[in-house]
Amino acid sequence: MLHFTAATSRFRLGRERANSVRSDGGWGVLQPVSATFNPPLRGWQRRALVQYLGTQPRDFLAVATPGSGKTSFALRIAAELLRYHTVEQVTVVVPTEHLKVQWAHAAAAHGLSLDPKFANSNPQTSPEYHGVMVTYAQVASHPTLHRVRTEARKTLVVFDEIHHGGDAKTWGDAIREAFGDATRRLALTGTPFRSDDSPIPFVSYQPDADGVLRSQADHTYGYAEALADGVVRPVVFLAYSGQARWRDSAGEEYEARLGEPLSAEQTARAWRTALDPEGEWMPAVITAADRRLRQLRAHVPDAGGMIIASDRTTARAYARLLTTMTAEEPTVVLSDDPGSSARITEFAQGTSRWLVAVRMVSEGVDVPRLSVGVYATNASTPLFFAQAIGRFVRSRRPGETASIFVPSVPNLLQLASALEVQRNHVLGRPHRESAHDPLDGDPATRTQTERGGAERGFTALGADAELDQVIFDGSSFGTATPTGSDEEADYLGIPGLLDAEQMRALLHRRQDEQLRKRAQLQKGATQPATSGASASVHGQLRDLRRELHTLVSIAHHRTGKPHGWIHDERRRRCGGPPIAAATRAQIKARIDALRQLNSERS
């Protein structure tokens, strides 16, 4: 039993005098919960539990970073409330069918039995269960049924990833109807925000200094705190850029570089071109990711990797690439395929290397051995990104790190740099992104076969890949280097077991070595080193663009200014068209301008 505070003791003594729980026909009878099932709690879980038992709120919102143990916290609350008859049954609402099974397994460790097979069509359940597992969609399809169950007996309702309650107006209305009379409601989320203004049910909003309504959590445990406590892994982002080429519906051909200032439409199309499984970018990035995974498995033999794809077609294509490149067939998980849940469980409990998924493994699914990720989707909302990265941060032993390979796209780089920022859901944001912004829509909210209208008539012509930068702890390290180079290998070969301080020191050391080598190569050179390396105009343009991008990275590290500022300063000094339309002479002039900028700042 717990013995934390006087408030907790008063709670227990009062509940011990409660009457035995009655039988209620087909709804079952309350099963006793043994006090022997009390797995040890982490620090944040203990503090939140003391707060909850001391205040006894009807509604409680716990915001904790993915991988920190929200499920265990909620199950401990449920066990306490059942043991002292504050409630007589538990209903847990989750986003997916697989999570129903995952929660039921976790509940057993707390002495709780939850029915993961409960169905609207057959609302009877065995009296041996303490409660049921349902999905948000299941509640929305028959809210009256769940309201009757909730009103029949004192009920604790646990909402896993409560932000899903605002996914559709009908969902929010159904959840309020079904659980408005619940005795207790416990809401959990690792991402207490949405990309729209849909209010999250049973969450309080308070005006900030500007009068804007912001969601209010009762207890918050962020990524930075969890990292300091060793609860989650440090995350290293390896951002890959490259020159992308495509043709539009009018037959016009375009070329642009990922990571450079582009219009939203150009960025979206360059991004999509890079993710094309038939191109050169994805095979190069997958090769790098697999090399990183093999490095980690030298220290952590069961470490696994996951590619997050945009849709079923590309997921299967990436799986074929993996099979060809690694001689090992990956596990493929598509949320609308039979047996997906079983395949996730098999992968989680096994030692195979790669998993390819669309959406089903992007949120809530617990696969602690995932250590390497390839973010191969064009979803760019903070919500989807945070939930996807959350699949890789669960720590099992000291020193484990996660490595995520991402396209060098401004939206993603900003999200990667701000991983430790704690966000709240804001209603009525004055400058909310336009619904027509090609980068604002989240493909994860579409069906897995849907294609956007902007894709019709679009043809990807190819994209090369190079390591643009490494992001860790909000800082950028390294300069652009081709895939397969020794410099890329230095970053891919970082030891698999390092704490945050060791990782930071090592990245600084690698960057200093890289910059020193680059400076030595450029010293004494009267012309760009690559000016005669390629006989063709195409080859010379490619090499000059690469050198220009390297100089931008060097300027970024020397000045501390963002890449966008450096590009703006370069344009101010020498003007000219976008780099895809620039001549060799114009690119050389830009290289000279950046060298001048670097000399001014050194």
Curated annotation (Swiss-Prot):
Amino acid composition bias (Basic and acidic residues), ranges on this chain: 430-439
GO molecular function terms noted in the UniProt entry? ATP binding; DNA binding; hydrolase activity
Which cellular component terms (GO) are annotated to the entry? cytosol; plasma membrane
Domain Helicase ATP-binding positions? 51-210
Q: Which Gene3D superfamilies match?
A: P-loop containing nucleotide triphosphate hydrolases (3.40.50.300)
**SUPFAM superfamilies xref list:** P-loop containing nucleoside triphosphate hydrolases
Q: Which SMART domains match?
A: DEXDc (SM00487)
Kindly list the residue ranges recorded as spanning the membrane: none
A single Pfam family it belongs to is ResIII
Composition skew (Polar residues), residue ranges: 523-534
Which biological process, per GO, is one annotated for this protein?
DNA restriction-modification system
Q: Which InterPro entries match?
A: Helicase/UvrB_N, Helicase_ATP-bd, Helicase_Restrict-Modif_Enz, P-loop_NTPase
Region (Disordered) residue ranges read 430-452, 518-538
Homology family: To M.leprae ML1624.
Q: What is this protein called?
A: Uncharacterized protein Rv2917
Native species of this protein? Answer: Mycobacterium tuberculosis (strain ATCC 25618 / H37Rv)
